[in-house]
Regions:
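Hydrophobic transmembrane alpha-helix bundles
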Residues: 116-127, 149-162, 207-225
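Solvent-exposed, amphipathic alpha-helical "stalk/arm" or coiled-coil-like segments used as scaffolds
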Residues: 86-109, 128-199
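Short, low-structural-confidence N-terminal segments
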Residues: 1-86, 184-227
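N-terminal targeting/tethering segments
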Residues: 45-144
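Alpha-helical structural motif
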Residues: 32, 61, 122, 158, ...
Length: 227
């Protein structure tokens, strides 16, 4: 099972086991603080109208990341154990956004992008199982903002459709193996640029990682920013 088909247990709210379709674990980045912005003032992407990430022609701004991050916190149940360190949470969330753009591009190529109706049907099933408020809490415990649920479902469904297109009737392992090279290919074709304050893009492993020169904002800095 590839990283775009995440299932499992999440802590909090009674550690309910969730099998939410094939939810992509998506953790949105915490907005960089003024001190970090000053530190990285000369970096190229940060000059592109406040972009946190640019993937092809798509972009997400730092303010959009901040809004999604805050909405995740607001949706967490009272007994939640939290989402981990800001650095870990933010990086994984940003990576999920990158995946959503890449998977959508592959879906367009193969003519199998999940439709609004398919996304709505998948969400309706989840809301029937967990209730509307319950789904928001389950998603938040996976660091998925309420506004990002449909995006996450579309990515998950499109990934599934592409997998079936590439290896009809194949096992999950066979389909994941077929999609892996496509993810790398399309990531390179689109181009992924991460604002250095958040890290850098590893094109071979298709992950967001620390900058080799240490320019990405440290966990301590993010914690200090939260006050």
């Amino acid at each position: 099972m590839g990283p775009w088909r995440a299932e499992g247990d999440y802590t909090g709210y009674g550690r309910r086991k969730i099998l939410v379709g094939e939810f992509v674990k998506s953790i949105l980045k915490f907005v960089a603080v003024a001190a970090a912005a000053l530190l990285l003032a000369g970096c190229s992407l940060t000059e592109k109208a406040g972009a946190a990430v640019v993937v092809g022609t798509e972009r997400m701004s730092s303010s959009e990341l901040a809004a999604e991050y805050q909405s995740v916190l607001d949706a967490l149940p009272a007994d939640s154990q939290g989402l981990g360190s800001p650095t870990q949470v933010n990086r994984t969330i940003l990576q999920s956004y990158v995946y959503s753009v890449i998977v959508n591009a592959i879906g367009v190529e193969y003519g199998v992008v999940a439709t609004d109706a398919q996304v709505a049907a998948e969400r309706a099933t989840l809301e029937k199982n967990y209730g509307k408020d319950g789904l928001l809490e389950v998603a938040a415990q996976g660091a998925i903002a309420p506004s990002a649920i449909d995006r996450t479902l579309r990515t998950s469904l499109t990934y599934r459709y592409v997998a079936e297109k590439l290896v009809p009737g194949g096992t999950t392992e066979e389909q994941d193996a077929a999609i892996g090279p496509k993810l790398i290919e399309f990531a390179k074709k689109l181009g992924v640029e991460i604002a250095p304050r958040y890290g850098q893009w590893n094109a071979e492993n298709i992950v967001v990682e620390d900058l080799a020169d240490g320019l990405s904002v440290s966990q301590d800095a993010l914690l200090a920013a939260q006050g």
